């Protein structure tokens, strides 16, 4: 049951609030809540409560002085200009008319008035103190406040904890300190505590670092108190500061000023909170240095490690190779050229010495693709002994510090510049199951480099550097000297729910402006508690056993949100797509067909989720898959086709599953969940949904319903996109995915729950708007309100807790149809016929226009077809001519082929005949040569025998002559005749006979040799004749270009030549 809320308005007069905006502030007070109990002193130790000075005013001032860490400022306070009113109307005129108003006295009035004691941020005294607020800071100053003290808290964003601290401090503080509070009007300003007597600044808290702001409940002793929490000393200690207002109504105005500060940003772009705008001649150069750590993902790539949003630390895995990526970008002053990086260093711990830094291996350096920054990449081996501290698993309750440094050579600077980054890290087990989030995975630090220009006489030549380094300071070092506080404010408001006014999230750097939130915004983390994953794993195991029955605990788990890693599978099971193979096959056929709405699809996909990396690239994989799904559905559903907005739902499904499965789930949502009914019959069912929503508003939010009636704001003006796109078009993705979880589980009626939740949480803002302002709020401010994931979770919890019965919705549906019937019956028939006639005339004109377009298209098509036909006929004639020529060439080629085949056969026959003849001649010559050789060998043997016999006979004769005394004298010792004349007569006769015999034998041998030579000459002549015939045949073969025959003749010639040589 929703709690009732009382609404009170504070009207601001021009006499008391001349410096305030001309807006009425709506204060929604919570009733029925339990008042925080007052604790005794025993609770101090548990909560870290510290009553400043135990009630001593001197001790209280001393404690506040310790909080202040800024050095004294010499700036003199100037006259503070009045604030411009945001609204128009009589109040604005009154403000301008009474522009000269005396400042409110700093001394407390003896009798409190009901008007708010607000004064311009201007000192009363002409002599300003060292701690006077900055003169150019636009702020609102509140008097008559009492500072009750501060306490340390562990849950800085907890409203219950803050109210408890407020109750304890108010009850236990005996002596308090009167202060003046200065609240800036922009988020770049600073909340300041001033001494009401001397206007001296006691403490300051930058507005962008305040975490939480809360006021006491009406009807309790703390109703005149408010408090805010801030992170003390660089977010390591959280404190709550409690104040009491002498006039209770001022609490609402103070909280409203805090909310205004967070809604507005300064129009100029200051480099820092206190620095003056710099000119190109300034000696301070600002650099933005970001650090990103990447780890080996085991697939050959390096992926950025996640960053814990709560602890602001990197999550590293033990023993995994890493890369350090540093990006340096100059953001202010004249551009300095970075020449190179000559060192990337790393060391565990913080505030380390230069000697403790260890050099990393540089992989690459150079300008980024857009040329705006300089990127350095280095490899980091965590297994090195130097980095053992950051390679051991870190306990869950601890974090480690790591220092990274990069040394850069800047062309215009005389010496190298070192940028030093200190970050927190946690080391996990290498096997730990981590779901990497898509959130920001880098840390960024701003550095302020002060340079001094070198005088001309000090430079050696014109090529020397122009500057020398005076100092280099980071933004963190600047803030360490100040009292720090932390980034976002949430103002609790009472009512049917506890809604908070969020400030910009910590990781959102874009300013609040009038530009709507881009669709596809929001990083969805895949991290999930192990216990939740185990619960879902058990549920899915049971569900797969019987897919037709949903498990009992499914609804409660879905209300808490399906884990991102399991959404693809769970959505298909919820939609009943576990057995839809026919849709998958049909999808593959549908994408090959043409869609009549192709142009509309192409136009819409370029506007779908431009803030998401998967869909932002024109012609990329994401847009291509999205185009296929929308095209396939437009062909599948011929009655409805493609309607504007379907691409957003298809894109959400495509982020969790492949194309085929996404198409199947889209078909199920359109048909089984009834989404396509909204597009039918001229959106008749959609108008019924609008009527149901307005009736629910009338029942649940009657004041907002009446306000919308007063400003003539109808449901179709702001809720059309909610129903047609299922909230997928404008809201962050983590919220969209949760809505789809609920829709697939509980049906399309979930839209009413979410719509009522949005209207409830925005009721207070909508009640202050007019028609134009309400439309702008729905278009711009409402989606931006849920850039914080915590706000989105609270909205979904509220939506799930809102009970809307189906019986009630059917009742409203019957009322709508009855109302439509009554309108039709009460309507004048003539007016109805005239309206129908106008509709038919418009339809007729549209059809005539379409007919003209089709006729024009037909004529154009006929002309194009005639031209194509003429070209085809010309091409056919040319091809026919080419065909006839080719046929004639084919006939000639066949005749030539036959002729050559006949000649080839004749040549083969002649070659075979000549070859046989040559072989016979060769055999004959071989036999003759063999016989000749045999005769020669016989004659040689015969000659040798005769010579041997002659030698034997001569030896015998010599022996006989030696034995004869008379003949011995005729021969000498060598056997030669001494005297020829004496022996001539005796042996002439024998010698002549022997010579004659030998001559006869020699003549016979010469005769045989002559005959053999003659036969050899005849054989050579025949061989020459054969070679001549072969030469003629060879010339004919060359003429016929038959290489195979040429090779045959060459082989025959070669063989014949070899045999002829052997014959010789």
Swiss-Prot record:
Could you tell me the keywords of this UniProt record? Cell cycle, Coiled coil, Cytoplasm, Cytoskeleton, GTPase activation, Phosphoprotein
Keyword Heme present in the record's keywords: the answer is no
Q: Where is this site: Glutamine finger?
A: 644
Q: Name one GO molecular function term.
A: small GTPase binding
Q: Where is the composition biased (Low complexity)?
A: 7-22
All copies of the PID domain together span 137-293
CDD domains, sorted: PTB_Rab6GAP
Which residue stretches belong to region Disordered?
1-101, 478-520
> Which residues of this protein are annotated with the site description Arginine finger?
603
Query: Under what name is this protein listed?
Result: Rab GTPase-activating protein 1
Species of origin reads Mus musculus (Mouse)
* Gene of this entry: Rabgap1
